[in-house]
């Protein structure tokens, strides 16, 4: 499904939901497929969504890096291997190895792939004693991120990793205290024509109670979005938010 943000804005208006700060630009929805990548492909599908956002907001960068227009999973696997060969996250390469077919990836691999494409990536680790503290810190960070819009840079979507799954956050809704998300495992829901607000919220909105984890990893693009050189980012470093 293409141009999800435009469609989402219309649906928010239709249901009278206000107070939502969304990513700038637009984004296409990619989903896992049973028998192909369901169970391991969520990270790759989320990368596709982030690339589509860059295609809308930075078309010249997209043309340089994806001149064929192809960013299927096998192409992304080659890009991740290329980033590792450049020396980015040698530890991750040692763990996953050369054959990425059918392999689940996480936030550090997202960091590595985009760094290899000279995109300036922020990686944030949330590590708390309690699930409530972790979700409170996550929601506060995401709220600030999406409310930081200005005239000189685009506010990007976020990649959110938690136990066993990952999703894309495309906004924050203050009136509902929810994350606005695209879940690569919820194709049927996203494709629906919503007739009531409950179904719409179930598909796109995530409250704290639906994210009961004590650890999260978040990836987003920085406001100075491109790098001239990534030699200082070969080792994966994160911002740690914790109560330990």
Swiss-Prot record:
<keyword id="KW-0963">Cytoplasm</keyword>
<comment type="similarity">
    <text>Belongs to the peptidase C78 family. ZUFSP subfamily.</text>
</comment>
<dbReference type="GO" id="GO:0019783">
    <property type="term" value="F:ubiquitin-like protein peptidase activity"/>
</dbReference>
<feature type="site" description="Involved in the stabilization of negative charge on the oxyanion by the formation of the oxyanion hole">
    <location>
        <position position="161"/>
    </location>
</feature>
<feature type="active site">
    <location>
        <position position="183"/>
    </location>
</feature>
<dbReference type="GO" id="GO:0051321">
    <property type="term" value="P:meiotic cell cycle"/>
</dbReference>
<keyword id="KW-0469">Meiosis</keyword>
<feature type="active site" description="Proton acceptor">
    <location>
        <position position="165"/>
    </location>
</feature>
<keyword id="KW-0378">Hydrolase</keyword>
<comment type="function">
    <text>Deubiquitinase with endodeubiquitinase activity that preferentially cleaves 'Lys-48'-linked polyubiquitin chains. Shows only weak activity against 'Lys-63' and 'Lys-11'-linked chains. Has a role in meiosis.</text>
</comment>
<protein>
    <recommendedName>
        <fullName>Ubiquitin carboxyl-terminal hydrolase mug105</fullName>
        <ecNumber>3.4.19.12</ecNumber>
    </recommendedName>
</protein>
<dbReference type="InterPro" id="IPR012462">
    <property type="entry name" value="UfSP1/2_DUB_cat"/>
</dbReference>
<feature type="active site" description="Nucleophile">
    <location>
        <position position="42"/>
    </location>
</feature>
<dbReference type="GO" id="GO:0004843">
    <property type="term" value="F:cysteine-type deubiquitinase activity"/>
</dbReference>
<dbReference type="GO" id="GO:1990380">
    <property type="term" value="F:K48-linked deubiquitinase activity"/>
</dbReference>
<dbReference type="Pfam" id="PF07910">
    <property type="entry name" value="Peptidase_C78"/>
</dbReference>
<dbReference type="GO" id="GO:0005737">
    <property type="term" value="C:cytoplasm"/>
</dbReference>
């Amino acid at each position: 499904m293409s141009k999800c943000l435009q469609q989402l804005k219309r649906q928010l208006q239709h249901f009278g939901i206000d107070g939502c700060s969304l990513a700038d630009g637009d984004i296409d929805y990619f989903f896992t497929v049973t028998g192909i990548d369901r169970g391991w492909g969520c990270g790759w599908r989320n990368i596709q969504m982030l690339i589509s956002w860059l295609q809308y907001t930075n078309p010249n960068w997209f043309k340089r890096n994806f001149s064929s227009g192809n960013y299927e999973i096998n192409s992304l696997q080659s890009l991740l291997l290329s980033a590792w060969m450049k020396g980015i996250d040698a530890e991750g390469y040692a763990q996953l190895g050369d054959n990425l077919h059918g392999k689940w990836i996480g936030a550090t691999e997202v960091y590595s792939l985009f760094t290899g494409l000279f995109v300036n990536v922020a990686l944030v680790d949330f590590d708390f004693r309690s699930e409530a503290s972790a979700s409170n810190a996550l929601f506060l960070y995401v709220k600030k991120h999406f409310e930081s819009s200005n005239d000189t840079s685009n506010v990007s979507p976020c990649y959110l990793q938690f136990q066993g799954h990952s999703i894309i956050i495309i906004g924050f809704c203050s009136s509902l205290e929810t994350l606005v998300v695209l879940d690569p495992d919820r194709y049927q829901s996203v494709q629906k024509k919503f007739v009531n607000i409950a179904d719409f919220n179930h598909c796109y909105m995530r409250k704290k109670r639906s994210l009961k984890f004590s650890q999260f990893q978040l990836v987003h693009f920085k406001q100075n979005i491109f790098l001239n050189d990534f030699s200082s980012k070969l080792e994966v470093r994160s911002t740690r938010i914790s109560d330990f």
